[in-house]
């Protein structure tokens, strides 16, 4: 009878004598748990240093949803800040969209992170900022365009929260899978202008609050394995309003590509990074919203248009181009101000296509390939 082979040795460059237990999705390296975690952290550190993401003394807001990406981001940022003496003032920032049975539960995970990591936590709600919860919005408009509302509001809410706590930079948990999906979505939409900048590791530099993505080159499967290896608690229930999101179709396509070609994710990102827009492709000029002061390419920012539509019953405002949208913008240009604006402050609004931070059944199946 043939003897059963044991797990292969750890392939760490550190000369580790342990047996490998995890296959790193990014490069196929077979590593033990501690060496995998160290390799993952070194990747993030290299990304931070090579791209000069932070300056000593900066207050950095970490967008925290309680999902795997933001939980790992907070843990790694805290670990690297201590290990390499970045000199950063790290703070957690969460947004409560008002989704019962989802966000209220995920915020419990964020609260645990606050206690375990010893980081200050600030929570802002859609209801306080905009006078609407996502449950209220879906009850009014249905589920067809709810992700548009949520993406716009969440992006602006994070900006507001970061300004509230005096942060000079905001970091989010967007990973390599998210970046590849965004490249594909912009190709399918024919959005050449966004395609050029969608892979930037730092965005919003033209405004007062740059956003950085330290996990840009980290594969989703590696993020989940890192969370498991370090016994990090996170919330993995899918948003009840997310199944029909456009991003979901791009995600499935990217995962199918990855099965055939493991480097498809990095190839998509590199392709996006190399895009150069011709001069005849008009890039939108950013200015400030005449109603609330946030950055926008139009006279009125999208958040203000969406709120105007909700408050007046014209729920297509900000979702589809229409004469009603133009009328509201013209009225704003003429100086007409109405209650229900999205408030004042700085930063940028626009749908960020909020990253899905769930570990669903498909993800669990994919992880089996990484364990020995």
Curated annotation (Swiss-Prot):
Its EC number is 2.7.7.-. Gene3D superfamilies: HUPs. This is Cytoplasmic tRNA 2-thiolation protein 1. GO terms for molecular function: nucleotidyltransferase activity; sulfurtransferase activity; tRNA binding. Pathway: tRNA modification; 5-methoxycarbonylmethyl-2-thiouridine-tRNA biosynthesis. GO terms for biological process: embryonic morphogenesis; oocyte development; protein urmylation; spermatogenesis; translation; tRNA thio-modification; tRNA wobble position uridine thiolation; tRNA wobble uridine modification. Belongs to the TtcA family. CTU1/NCS6/ATPBD3 subfamily. It is found in: Cytoplasm. Residues 341-351 have a biased composition (Gly residues). Residues 335-372 are annotated as: Disordered. Keywords: Cytoplasm, RNA-binding, Transferase, tRNA processing, tRNA-binding. InterPro entries: CTU1-like_ATP-bd, CTU1_C, Ncs6/Tuc1/Ctu1, Rossmann-like_a/b/a_fold, TilS/TtcA_N, tRNA_thiolation_TtcA_Ctu1. SUPFAM superfamilies: Adenine nucleotide alpha hydrolases-like. Plays a central role in 2-thiolation of mcm(5)S(2)U at tRNA wobble positions of tRNA(Lys), tRNA(Glu) and tRNA(Gln). Directly binds tRNAs and probably acts by catalyzing adenylation of tRNAs, an intermediate required for 2-thiolation. It is unclear whether it acts as a sulfurtransferase that transfers sulfur from thiocarboxylated URM1 onto the uridine of tRNAs at wobble position. Residues 361-372 have a biased composition (Basic and acidic residues). Pfam families: ATP_bind_3 (PF01171), zn-ribbon_14 (PF16503).
């Amino acid at each position: 009878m043939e003897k059963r082979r044991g797990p292969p040795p750890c392939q760490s460059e550190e000369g580790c004598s342990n047996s490998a237990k995890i296959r790193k999705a990014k490069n196929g390296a077979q590593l033990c748990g501690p060496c995998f975690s160290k390799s993952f952290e070194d990747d993030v550190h290299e990304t931070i240093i090579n791209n000069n993401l932070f300056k000593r003394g900066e207050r950095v807001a970490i967008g925290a949803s309680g999902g795997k990406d933001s939980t790992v981001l907070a843990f790694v940022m805290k670990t690297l800040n201590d290990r390499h003496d970045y000199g950063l003032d790290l703070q957690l920032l969460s947004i409560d969209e008002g989704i019962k049975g989802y966000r209220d539960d995920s915020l419990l995970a964020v609260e645990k992170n606050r206690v375990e990591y010893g980081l200050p936590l600030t929570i802002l709600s859609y209801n306080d900022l905009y006078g609407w919860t996502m449950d209220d919005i879906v009850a009014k408009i249905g589920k067809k365009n709810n992700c548009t509302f949520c993406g716009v509001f969440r992006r602006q809410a994070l900006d507001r929260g970061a300004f509230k706590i005096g942060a000079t930079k905001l970091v989010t948990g967007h990973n390599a899978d998210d970046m590849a999906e965004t490249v594909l979505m912009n190709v399918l939409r024919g959005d050449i202008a966004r395609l050029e900048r969608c892979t930037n590791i730092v965005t919003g530099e033209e405004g007062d609050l740059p956003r950085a993505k330290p996990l840009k080159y980290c594969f989703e499967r590696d993020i989940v394995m890192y969370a498991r290896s370090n016994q990090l608690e996170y919330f993995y229930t899918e948003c009840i309003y997310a199944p029909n999101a456009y991003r979901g179709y791009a995600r499935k396509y990217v995962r199918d590509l990855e099965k055939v070609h493991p480097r498809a994710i990095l190839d998509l990102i590199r392709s996006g990074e190399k895009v150069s827009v011709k001069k005849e492709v008009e890039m939108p000029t950013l200015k400030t919203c005449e109603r609330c002061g946030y950055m926008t390419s139009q006279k009125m920012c999208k958040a203000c248009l969406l709120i105007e539509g909700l408050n007046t019953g014209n729920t297509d405002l900000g979702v589809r181009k229409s004469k009603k949208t133009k009328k509201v913008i013209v009225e704003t240009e003429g100086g007409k101000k109405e209650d229900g604006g999205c408030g004042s402050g700085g930063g940028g609004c626009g749908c960020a296509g909020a990253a899905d931070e769930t570990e669903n059944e498909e993800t669990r199946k994919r992880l089996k390939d990484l364990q020995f």
